[in-house]
Each structure stands twice: as C-alpha cells, then as structure tokens.
C-alpha cells in the first residue's frame, strides 16, 4: 500500500469545543439575564437540531440565515421573546469567538510532520460552511490541500458520497488514502466501506477491542509517517 493522501476528521480529532455546547449556551443566556434549566435547554437544542438537519443542504453559502432560524427556534422553545432579532445577532457573535475551539497539543506539529513527509492532507468532516472560518481562526487552513464537508457534499459520513468527493478533489484512489477520525461508525466504517484505510483516534481508550488501526494520540501517526510512504501502515506497531 503506497499512501499518498491522509484525510482527517476535525471535531475531537484535530480540535474540540470547550466548554460543551450546552454550557456555552447557558453562559450566553446568563450574560443576557436569562436563567434556564439545563434540561429545558437540552430539549430546545434537540428540537432545533432536527430543523438544522432538515434544512442544512438548502443553505449552502447562507449559514447566517440558517443559524438565525436555528437560534430563533431555540429562543421560542425557551419562551424568550426576540422581536427585533437582537438576541439572534448577539448569540451568533457569541459563537463566532475563536476561544470556544481548542487544538489538541499535538495537532499542529503532527500535521506539519506528516506534510513534510510529502503527503497530501485533506479534511472529511460532517460540518457546514462555518468549518472554513474555524480552520482559519485556528490557523490550520494552510496545512490542507483539500477540504470536504457534508453541507456542500450533501452527504454525511459514513455515506460513501462524501468520501468519494474527497477522493476526487485529492485526485486519489481509495487504495492510496488513509482516513483518521475519532468516531467508529462515521469515520472507520465509512472509510472502510469504500476502500480507504481507517485509523481510529481513541484518546480515552474506549475501543481497545476495535478491529482497526488505533492510536491514542496524533503523535503516534507522526511516528509512522515514513512507513506510510514506503510500506504502508504496520498494524502490529499501531495497535496495542
């Protein structure tokens, strides 16, 4: 196996949200004078998520409009009146702050090391247009030769279509690619289904019996970078 392209998931693989989404919302509501029970907020978010999933593909390039619908629904479910849209605008600004997204300590050095070995790097993410802003704010855009996300692909991992679009953009065949991600069903099974070699990022050691290559830290991928090009992955070295 001669690997040419290494694809990465983003959320909980390269970076993570901190604090949690619910906590970020609760903090915003508190700063604007609203006290909401976490369980009630959770229910409102779940209902708004259903709207988001149903409308996502209709709002390519128009995420501000979709988020306005999404946030308005949350406020309605919480019984909060926002007649002139001020709260919607404020919560969008709140979420645009880079501080909510944090890189794992080894992310940047690993991407640079793998890129230095001559591999093309790509992203395959269940995400929307906002991903491009997140990558830019985290100064990650420069590392990637291609970026593919579900809103524009009109498909979510583990569906084959999003992987196929990523391969097309990278001008790469499945046999020449690796996909690194933290979600077994979406990343591992999705990649394997079309012939891409998957690698599971298992930071919390929850999948010790996984039937795939498994790493606990992106640095383990860096250590195998030379083998990626010359011999492919060596399972005995990558697993326990």
Task: Name every feature range the model reports, one short phrase each.
Residues 1-6, 16-17, 30, 35, ...:
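Asp-based, Mg2+/Mn2+-dependent phosphohydrolase catalytic module
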Residues 2-109, 117:
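N-terminal helical cap/lid subdomain that shapes the substrate entry/recognition surface
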């Amino acid at each position: 196996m001669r690997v040419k392209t290494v694809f990465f998931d983003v959320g909980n693989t390269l970076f993570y949200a901190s604090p949690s989404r619910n906590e970020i919302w609760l903090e915003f509501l508190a700063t604007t004078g609203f006290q909401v029970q976490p369980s009630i907020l959770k229910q409102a978010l779940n209902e708004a998520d259903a709207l988001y999933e149903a409308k996502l593909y209709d709002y390519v390039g128009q995420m501000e409009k979709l988020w306005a619908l999404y946030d308005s629904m949350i406020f309605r479910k919480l019984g909060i009146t926002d007649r002139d849209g001020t709260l919607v605008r404020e919560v969008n600004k709140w979420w645009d702050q880079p501080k909510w997204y944090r890189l794992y300590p080894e992310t940047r050095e690993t991407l640079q090391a793998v890129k230095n070995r001559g591999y093309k790097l790509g992203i395959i993410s269940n995400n929307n247009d906002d991903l491009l802003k997140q990558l830019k704010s985290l100064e990650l855009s420069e590392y990637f030769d291609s970026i593919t996300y579900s809103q524009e692909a009109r498909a979510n991992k583990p569906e084959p279509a999003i992987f196929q679009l990523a391969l097309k953009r990278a001008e790469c065949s499945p046999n020449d690619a690796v996909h690194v991600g933290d979600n077994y069903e979406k990343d591992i099974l999705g990649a394997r289904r079309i012939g891409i070699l998957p690698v599971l990022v298992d930071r919390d050691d929850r999948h010790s019996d996984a039937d795939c290559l498994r790493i606990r830290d992106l640095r383990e991928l860096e250590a195998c970078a030379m083998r990626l090009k010359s011999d492919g992955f060596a399972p005995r070295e990558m697993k326990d």
